[in-house]
C-alpha cells in the first residue's frame, strides 16, 4: 500500500455478525484486554522491536525506531476540504542543521539545510464526529532550539515542513491560514522506523518495493540567499475556498396543464451556494456581501476570499445564510427574481390577455382586418364600407353582450328589488305623460275662447247624456260624445235625480271643440316617446265613472228674473242658459 493512502475496511455482513457475537462473550473480552496490556508493556515493546530488527537485517536493511518528542502543533486545511494538523517533533536520530555562507557581487548570506523526517498521514476522528488528517514532521533538537529563539527561523521550519508534506504525499495545504495551536501535539504519539540498506550485504529475501528512508529537503536557493529575505515573512494572498453552486426549482402540476399559461419556466426559483471553510470555527469576523448578481465572502483570520458572479439576478433582501459548525460549511440560499413582465403594446397598454376591454379591442381590430383582407380585391371605397360595417357589427355584438350581462345581473338580484325597480319606472313614466298632457292643456288655454250664447236642441242633445228606461225600470246613462282628455265634463240632469255639470270657465268649450285637433297633435308626441325609449309603456286609459250625488230638487234650478223670463241656475257653477221659449226648453 502506498504511503498516505487511506485504509479501506473490507468486511462482510457475516464477519460483522460473528464479531458482534464475540464481543458479547466474556472470554473474548478477557483475551482482548490481555492483548492490549501485552502490547502496551515496555518490555513487550522492546522485544517486538528486536524481532523486527532481525527480520529487516535478513532482507539487507538496517532499521531504527524513532520516538518523536512533541514540540509544536500547527493547524491548516488539506485540499480545502478537511482540517489538517502538523506535529513538529524532535528526534536526535535526525541529521543536524547545516549552513553555508554564500557571497554575490552585491550581497552575501547563508544557505541552510534542514534534515527532517516525515511520517505518513493518519486519520483522526474528533469528538463531534469530524474526520481530520494528522502529519508528523521530525527535526533535530538543535534545529528546534534555533527556531525557539527566533520567530523568523521558526517560519522557515514551518515552510520546510509544508513543502515536504506537499511534495511527498501529493496534497495541497493552506499556507495562508496556517496557525499555531495551544497544545504541543495533536492525537496520540506513534513511533516510526528509519530503514537504510546495508552496504555490501546480499539480502536473503527481496526487499520491499518502497523504502521508507528518511527524507531530507532543502529550501530553494532564491529564498535563502539573503537572511533578511529568507527570514522575512512575505504577505500572501487569501485562499479561495471550495464552493458548489446549485439551482433549485419547484415542480407544480399546474405547469403541465394544456394551456398557454401553463408553460414551465426554465428560470430557477433559488440559488444555493455551499462553501467549505474547514479552518473557520465560527462566523465571527467573516463578511458576506450579496448584490443583485454578485456574492463576496471575506475573512481575515483565517484568510479567505471568494467572489462569485451569479447567472441570475437575486433578491438580496430575502436571502438566507446558515453555518454548520460540525462540518464547517456555509450554505447561502438566494431567491431568484422573477422574469421581467412582457413588453407593452405600441399604444402603451399592457398585455391584452389580462384585460377584457383590451380583448374586445383586439377582437374588433382582428375582425376589421379580416373584413379588409376579404375586400382587398374590390374597389377602395368598397373596402372602406366593409371595414366600417364590420366595425359597426362588432360594436353591436359588444352592446348585446353588455345588455346580456346587465340582464344576468338583474336576474341575480332579489325579487323584491326587481319589483321595486319596475314600480319606480312605471311611476316615472306616468309623471312624464302627465307633464306632456299639462303642456298640451296649456296650449289649448291660449287659443281663442268661443262664447256660445245660443245652442240648438240638437247641439245640446249631443252634449247631454240621455236616459232611457230599461224594461226593469232602471235608468242607464249613455255617453254620446266624449273628448279624449277634457278639462271638465258637462252633464245635464234628465230627471229630478240628475243634474248638469258645467265647466268652470268658458275655455272648456274651446277645449271640446278642439279635442280632435289636440288628439291629432298629441299622437306624434306619443310615437316619438315610443321611438325614444322602447322600455317606456303608455299609461292605461281610465274612464271616470259617474258618481251618485244627491241632486237638489228641480224647483231650485228655476228662477224668474226681473223681465219675467225663466232662468235655470246651476248651484255648482256660475254658467247659465237664458231660455227664450219655455215649452221648447222644458226639461221635465
From Swiss-Prot:
Pfam families: PIH1, PIH1_CS. Residues 350-361, 435-447 have a biased composition (Polar residues). GO terms for biological process: axonemal dynein complex assembly; cilium-dependent cell motility; epithelial cilium movement involved in extracellular fluid movement. Residues 202-212, 362-382, 393-433, 448-460 have a biased composition (Basic and acidic residues). The keyword Cytoplasm applies. This is Protein kintoun. Belongs to the PIH1 family. Kintoun subfamily. It comes from Oryzias latipes (Japanese rice fish). Keywords: Cytoplasm. Required for cytoplasmic pre-assembly of axonemal dyneins, thereby playing a central role in motility in cilia and flagella. Involved in pre-assembly of dynein arm complexes in the cytoplasm before intraflagellar transport loads them for the ciliary compartment. HAMAP family: Kintoun. It is found in: Cytoplasm; Dynein axonemal particle. Disruption phenotype: Organ laterality defects due to altered ciliary motility. Typical randomized left-right mutant leading to situs inversus. Fishes lack directional liquid flow in Kupffer's vesicle (an organ functionally equivalent to the mouse node in terms of left-right specification). Although the number and length of cilia in Kupffer's vesicle seem normal, their motility is completely lost. Homozygous fish are viable but develop primary ciliary dyskinesia. Furthermore, male mutant fish have impaired sperm motility leading to reduced fertility. The keyword Cytoplasm applies. One of its GO terms (cellular component) is dynein axonemal particle. Residues 199-223, 338-498, 510-535 are annotated as: Disordered. The gene is dnaaf2.
